[in-house]
């Protein structure tokens, strides 16, 4: 069905509708500076990501389209690229890098398993994500540049990783009622 995105202004205690198009808009992701919202739309039955000013001014801008599904998942802290989810091809779901300047899509995490919930480190050097490659959801961390080593950081399951603002800790849920934290060595 049709869904739209709304922005709630805490200081004014008021909600403003941001999208008005036919079809559904979902998967909203804030830019790091808060000026934009990126979101997926199914209005044309393809994979399309739009960018819209978070204050509602201007028209939505189509920034990426693919024949298979894509959706935004996280914005880099320098606002130069997005981590996006994708389906299709030879794997289940993957995490891709979408460069906002060149509009190029390149693989970040590509496995034959479900990979989701990416969290980009505050220095934009690492990505944490959940994957079911071990047979259950676990948290992995991978370098973003050059050599792409991958490390499993959970051992009792894990989902929804998030970095502490200074990048020195990674948080994730084992179950909805159990939050875990893993220390991260700066510069590692």
Specify the residue positions occupied by each region the protein language model found.
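Alpha-helical solenoid scaffolds in eukaryotic macromolecular assemblies
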Residues: 6, 56, 122-125
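C-terminal structured "cap/appendage" subdomains that terminate the fold
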Residues: 166-188
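Short loop/turn segments that connect beta-strands within beta-propeller blades
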Residues: 9-13, 53-57, 99-103, 143-147, ...
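Long hydrophobic segments that form regular secondary structure
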Residues: 98-101, 124-126
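Acidic, glycine-rich loop-and-beta core segments that form the ion-binding/anion-interacting portion
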Residues: 81-83, 93-100
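Structural motif
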Residues: 2-6, 45-51, 90-96, 135-140, ...
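Conserved beta-propeller blade repeats
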Residues: 20-42, 61, 66-85, 110-130, ...
């Amino acid at each position: 069905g049709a869904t739209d995105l709304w922005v709630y202004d805490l200081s004014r205690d008021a909600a403003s509708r941001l999208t008005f198009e036919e079809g559904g808009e979902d998967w909203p992701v804030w830019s790091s500076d808060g000026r934009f919202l990126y979101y997926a739309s199914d209005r044309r039955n393809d994979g399309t990501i739009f960018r819209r000013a978070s204050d509602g001014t201007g028209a939505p801008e189509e920034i990426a389209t693919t024949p298979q599904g894509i959706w935004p998942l996280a914005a880099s802290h320098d606002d130069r690229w997005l981590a996006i989810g994708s389906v299709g091809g030879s794997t289940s779901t993957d995490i891709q890098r979408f460069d906002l300047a060149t509009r190029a899509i390149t693989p970040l995490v590509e496995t034959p398993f479900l990979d989701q919930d990416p969290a980009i480190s505050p220095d934009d050097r690492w990505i944490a994500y959940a994957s079911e490659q071990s047979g259950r959801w676990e948290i992995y961390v991978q370098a973003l540049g050059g050599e792409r080593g991958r490390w499993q950081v959970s051992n009792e399951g894990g989902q929804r990783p998030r970095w502490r603002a200074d990048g020195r800790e990674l948080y994730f849920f084992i179950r909805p009622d159990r939050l875990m934290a893993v220390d991260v060595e700066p510069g590692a």
